[in-house]
Amino acid sequence: MIGQYYSAITPFSTGGQPVQIYSLVNEGVPIGTASSLLVNRFLIYQLVVTFYALFMFIIRFKLLYAEVRLALPFVVMGCLINVIILVMIFGFLLNEKFIRNILEKSIKILYRFKIVKDIKKSEEKINNTLLDYKISIEELKKDKKTTLQLILVSIIQLTIGFSITFFVYLALGFEKGHFIDIIAIQSLHYMAVSFMPTPGTAGAAEGGFYMLFKVIFPKKILSFALILWRFIDYYLRVLVTGLVTLIDFICRKRKIPIN
């Protein structure tokens, strides 16, 4: 819950993991174990959400191409970024030197454009991150049962999250079944906007919803559907997780057992 709150309010959802590590360490979990747990979770989640969206993209390509062709470049770009990230991470196991060379050259290019300020610091950070990923992948390979359980949980989590729009659809009085279409479009919407640098992908999430879901909702209802979906999916989540974070903070200050 605490991680969800900080992920929701920080650019690129970068605030969640450090806070979760801090929270776990405070509970007595060694920092190495805490980091490994979260890296494992991230790897599984990225793997599942990427293949989930790609599968939906394939089975609903005709619908997307016919009705929301203008949004396809954003969807393809989002999918491509996720695939590249996964290829780099898992490719590190197969050819560590090759992946390191690519990343080092990328950092130098970014330095020339003044996007990266300190080359050595950036290289050190990437090397540490790659090492964490390597260790985590080895752990996932050893414990196949837990890995399969994490994959299943991630699929269920994503399906529930992507189903919010379907229940918004029903709440607005529509009865005709569009469940798979909505799940497919919502998963691709997630891929298209997930790398936007604003907290909660603000702006991109709304614009993407409007572009993609016009095939599902009538134009006169689309704005209401957008507002209702955004409130449930983002603002309600921030409210609930923020409240939990506040309670956790108060309990820690007063040293009250949270359990």
Stretch-by-stretch model annotation:
Residues 138-152:
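Membrane-interface helix starts
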Residues 112-131:
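Short, membrane-interfacial amphipathic segments enriched in basic
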Residues 24, 129-141:
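A short amphipathic helical element positioned immediately N-terminal to and/or at the very start
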Residues 29-31, 146, 175-180, 218-219:
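Membrane-helix interface segments
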Residues 1, 158-167, 178-194:
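Hydrophobic alpha-helical segments embedded in the membrane of multi-pass proteins
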Residues 149-156, 189:
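Alpha-helical transmembrane segments of MFS and MFS-like solute carriers/permeases
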Residues 3-118, 198, 202-259:
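Transmembrane helix-loop-helix hairpins in multi-pass inner-membrane proteins
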Residues 48-50, 131, 153-165:
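Core segments of transmembrane alpha-helices
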